[in-house]
Amino acid sequence: MPQLLKRLAFQVGSVPNERTTTFTSISNDGHHISLRPLVNLNSTSEEEFPFEWVFAGLNTGVRVVPISEGVVEQDFNFWLDTNCYLNLPNTHRGEVKTIWTQWDSGSVAENGEVFPNGPDNPGVPFFELWHPLDPNRVEQVLLNDPLTTAEATKARSIVFKVREGQGYDGLVIVTGRWAQGFLSKQGDATVDGLNFLRTIELEDGSREALVLYGSDAEKFPQEYLGYESGAHVEVHGLKWDVIESN
């Protein structure tokens, strides 16, 4: 089922915190984007790049293994990753192994370990707490009862992927009213080559951009009605393929 997860807390070390408005979009087929814009900017580097991290992946890059009732292992190899794109020092490379545990409240606890100094050095454990939102609502409504959760499973799920050979990599995932996108210019490796999107469809059918970042952000598709899987769209000279539509 398509999902829109909001992160409630993030912990590395002994003190939990949350400095971002992090949403993760997961399509019906398992493609995913996690967009993590900072709420307050506390340094020059944060002003230059106002995101904790952004990554996106296809369903071929995630492995899900059930552990027990309400517990699964999910191992990720991200296709698009700002840390890798910018070649930031002391950041993890390669597969990220995580354990996800469903809580009675509807929240989901994620536990994992990253290796910012390489796989031969000690890892750094982390904890993230998530809660699914109703993707069909304009407001940020937490899913915590069977009826609204059942309705949320019917949410629209559309995925656009940049066609190869154009000098860009990109993914846009639409879950219900919400859309998130990642677009990067190949061979740039600076913040100038990165573009991000987060929009919400309002009650009157118009779309409001909550995040529209980057000099090429106008190349994101922002109209999502009438597209079937296998369709194509060109936006300001950039061609996108619809790889999923329910």
From Swiss-Prot:
The keyword NADP does not apply. GO terms for cellular component: cytoplasm; nucleus. Keywords: Cytoplasm, Nucleus. InterPro entries: Hri1, Hri1_N, Hri1_N_sf. Pfam families: HRI1 (PF16815). It is found in: Cytoplasm; Nucleus. CDD domains: HRI1_C_like, HRI1_N_like. Belongs to the HRI1 family. This is Protein HRI1. The gene is HRI1.
